[in-house]
Amino acid sequence: MATATQKRKTTPAGISIAPDTLRKALATVRAAVGGMARPVLQNVYIGGGVVEATDLEMRISCEIDYQGPEILLPYARLSAILGAASSQEVLIGVGESSCTISIGSSKWTLPTEPATEFPAWSVADAARKPVARIPADQFARAVRSVSYAADNESSRYALGGVMVEVQDGSATFVATDGRRLSRYDVEIDQAVDPSATLWPSRAINTIAALASHSEGAVQLESAGSELIATIEGIVVASRVVEGRYPRWRDVFPEREASATVADRQEMLAATRQAAIVTSEQSKGVTYSITSEGISLAAKSSEAGESSVTCPILDFGQAATVKLDPVFVCDFLKACDDGEPVEIEAVDSSSAVVLRSGDCRGVIMPLCEE
């Protein structure tokens, strides 16, 4: 991202803007507003036809219909003012160290910092390399289906990101914390070179949230250590996650195994019921797969025992394995409605593979106590 030594040019004048336009822009850039450590980053920059916010780790800019002078405005107070007043027009007068905001008969005077203090950012078009163009709804679904498995607390920083691997006309989204892995494949309609980019979980979840409200496409690009996503006039930029990502394709076992099929909602409900008696010391649920159904059992000295049965739609092969119910629920909640779940388990010590629609997951078993 840009350093604080880079400055913007500014000229004194005023601003007239529709409140709904400004409210929408503030909501768009909210996730990138900085904290107390750098007071200038608690402001939003308005100028050059955009509203911008950055915390130096992520930057969001949103196009607005405004070509007036540059100004920094405090995000929190501006949001509160727009939320408390209603009018067809917001008038902002710019002074040397303050601004006035007028909405209808109400007026506020706020201290401001020079717009030149806001960190500038730019990437030459020649430096940008296309990664993929993905329909916004598919992008949001892909991120939702994998991001829960990333580990943002690990000392292995790479595990705190979501890998986007592009090859052979598809983009594969992957996340793992070392104990589970999630994968989702999306077809792309753009001819690009094969690539693998590791996106920070926070940034890619922000992009997905914005994409969920768009009917267009998400254009992903890389530029050195920067990753850039563009969605209908909104640009999100972030640093690439450093570190070596696991060889995730090796996690999916190559074996001959028959999967058992169950209704996703029934499997989710059964797992939640069985997990009621689990604890931090006894967190596992034992899944016993038979031709009669899936029996779920849990036990802890402080909370008691549970026994639940989940019916099946098709039987694969018998197996018993102990899994973390949180991991199972996370996978099932991320899958699309209406799709059954396939459970591929072979024994108590081997990884369990889950499939539902376009979602793929691997969960490592827990040791029997």
Q: What kind of region is each of these model predictions?
A:
Residues 1-369:
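Structural preference for solvent-exposed beta-strand-turn elements
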